[in-house]
């Protein structure tokens, strides 16, 4: 796509936009959506620690406890910081070129990460514990499988038709069935 790092890519490149849209869309359908692993901070940490051994890679979904925000980051390692504190090393596309750390405290099964939903928004502290279920993992392998089309089998709206109604410039209604 014309860059040696993600931050060097031209966001206006149509082929790149299509690629980004494809990978984003995979998160909404099976098998990707049904392969998401939800867990406590310690369960998520343990899976990330096994990435090299099991050959799988993941994206981590982080969510605000009130559901008002979320973001995906890419883990690539774990550091033991001592005293029960671990740092999951991540790539965050909102901070290109930086190694970021999602902290997991094994003493109370909590996590925290400072993030923003996009680079133009002030960062906030995302936190959670074993009860909040605000961390998840999406296996990369599930995104490489053929994705299921939720409306192609005739069970979606396309099988029963739909109605579109829009006002004309003169104020009357135009209908399409």
PLM features per residue range, with description:
Residues 67-70, 79-177:
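Cys-His-centered catalytic/binding microenvironment captured across papain-like cysteine peptidases
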Residues 36-90:
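Active-site-adjacent substructure of cysteine-protease-like catalytic cores
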Residues 8, 14, 19, 43-46, ...:
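Glutamate identity and glutamate-enriched acidic tracts
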Residues 1-42:
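Cysteine-nucleophile protease catalytic domains, especially the papain-like/related folds used
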